[in-house]
Amino acid sequence: MKHDPHLLDDYIKHILAAIERIQRYCADANELAFLENDMLQDAVIRNFEVIGEASKNIDHKFPNFLKQHPSLPLIDAYEMRNALAHGYFKVDLEILWKTINNHLPDLQEQLKNLRN
């Protein structure tokens, strides 16, 4: 089945928009503030779910794209989405905070470079 290549760019835009929202939500927070703010956590988790769902769609609909860009951690993003969506109250918020600060900027840069 052939898929519309414009959809690939749409999925990438969804991921980038979710990353930007997470960064905006957390811009004025340090780790302690994040760990104490359940509304912020919920907003961030929701956007990680968006990232994971778009990543899954890229993997399923455009498998050659991931083969061409093996350094993109989109499978990891989908697995994280599953852990968040099905972990309920077992989410490790410290890992989530580290992911926000240590991994999202790299993913954002990689995807922006692919779009240029």
Language model features with spans:
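Solvent-exposed interaction patches of small proteins and small membrane subunits
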Residues: M1-N116
